[in-house]
Each structure stands twice: as C-alpha cells, then as structure tokens.
C-alpha cells in the first residue's frame, strides 16, 4: 500500500500513510463476504452489503489525531460518508464510528483502533475513459443522395468497439455530448436510451454504478436538470433495453444512434482491498 487517504464529505483530506500518522495494516478490509439466501440447490438474493472493519492508526504526534477525529465525527453527524482511497485509485464510502486505544499512549506515540463502516460493500476503481466520436455521412441528421427521392435517408449507425478488461460485467458512467435528441447507444445485446433533448454545448451524464444511479442534463450555462425518469428501463436488467445494464466483459460492439460523442468510464469492483496493493513500499 503506497497511499491511504480519507476524504470527508466537505473535502477535508486526512493522509493515513504519512510520516507522523499511518495505518498499520488493512487486514480486515481485505476480507469480504456475500450476503445470500440458501435455495433448494444453491443460493439466491445475492448482494454485498455494508460491513464493519477495524483500522489501526499509529502516530508519533498524537495531537494530529484531533483533526482526524473532527473530520470523522463531522461526517457521522451530517450522515454523509467520507471516502477511503487506497493507492490513489480504489475507493469506498465510509464512516468512522468509534475508537479504542490499542496501547497506553504517551506524548510521542499513540495507537488507536478505529471502527469503520464500509458503506458500499465493494471497492471501486475507475478504468481509463474510453472516448467515442462517431461520424455519419454528412454533418446533418440526414443523408442527401445525388438523386431525387421522396425523402432523404436517415444516416446509418456507426459501429465501434468497447473493451471491458475486468473479466466480469462492469458498472459504468457515460457522458453524451450535445446537441442530440433522444440519444441511444447499444453495447452487446442491450440498448441504453434516454428520452431527452441534449442542447448544443451541453451534455447528459448517466451514472450506472452500484452506489449511485442518476441521469442529468447540463446546459451550456451550467444549469443541471434531473432527468432520471426519462431513462428507458424496459423490463429491468437482462431485458435488452435497461439503461443501467452493466457492460459485459471483453470486447463488445458499440452502435451509436447519431452524431454525438460519448465518454465511457467503467469500474473494476472488488469485495475487499485488492491483494495486489500489497506489492508496494509500505507493507499492509
């Protein structure tokens, strides 16, 4: 583990891997457990829920614990979680809800065991953004052929490739850039559609993560509109038209309905802090 930080809901950052304040280990945070119900020949109702873990903090300057505990308590009082970040990439929302002394403190050393509520049930890591800027023939919404027909033809859909390297279906966020009307795109066998107008200079943001599902439109002047109810949900996950459907593993065909650009960010998810974070300068 190279880095460990706690960021409170108001943006205060507590460095938990500094010279004068550090976490001894992340042992309990590396473990995980699924919640499930036994079925006749297997399991059902599978989920990963919030859990508690112990985090041991050591310091050579005990006074710095006061600032840390102030940030921890402010989040609990506001009922707004902070965020733990490991190695600058793996994150989970968390509360610090209690503490106990690991050793008798003295002016130059203290060890405190904190009780952490891990809110999300998983750790998430954002993968590099994939940018897609499809172009159809011409710059308008129709293809103008060099012969007279009763109507011009609609542009053909553009096929691109999305790569999900996680080995499992991935949560994602997407940003669609205007102008466009009722934008939709297809990945694999699912169509992601929102019945909304995205203005020129604006964008639509779609969040399909386990911790947050939202759809908003941001105008050029910065005004934000909540359009959550305009997302097409079909008959739910697996129906082929669910706007929050996780993206399948591997390479999938991406088909875009128009001339709008898409920024797609997928998330790797782990039940516990990944073991590969052990290979670093500070043992954890």
Outline where the language-model segments fall:
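Oligomerization/assembly interface segments of phage tail-like spikes and tubes
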Residues: 32-63, 108-122, 252
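Structural motif
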Residues: 9, 86, 187-189
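Intrinsically disordered, low-complexity segments enriched in serine, threonine, and glycine
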Residues: 131-284
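Solvent-exposed edge beta-strands and adjacent loop segments
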Residues: 1-50, 89-102
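Short beta-strand and beta-hairpin "edge-sheet" elements
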Residues: 22-23, 81-128, 267-270, 283-284
